[in-house]
């Protein structure tokens, strides 16, 4: 969104790639419709967002004309209650075996540098923080950055896992992510 508003001349340089959340939403929606369980209009997919930027990106994305994601809400709003329900609900264990974990690339996407790592880009500049991202985008806009193949900007320090709507401290989130990836 920052690029759309402040640096529209850079939009053509934004890589048109689906986020793991969007790719998963498309897949899930297609699978449910293909099985004949639901019509496309009956499928609602909600993104559990770590930050306002990710939530607003659903409807204002540069790289997609439409989205399979219905809407978004904050992980911090549901985390405690969700954990309580999952621990107490015996039926959760019945379908827990059917739950799959995403790839390490998809899981790592939300950390600073996760996009570049997933894409296999070595010569990348990883920027996190709104002011820092603005400064780098300004330099790119003025054609002052030539020795970088890819720039990954995150509004939040540490990437999305450091977002203000996350359920745990960003340092704890980073440690947890490193253990899973």
Which stretches of residues belong to each language-model region?
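Iron-sulfur-associated redox domains of electron-transfer enzymes in respiratory
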Residues: 1-181
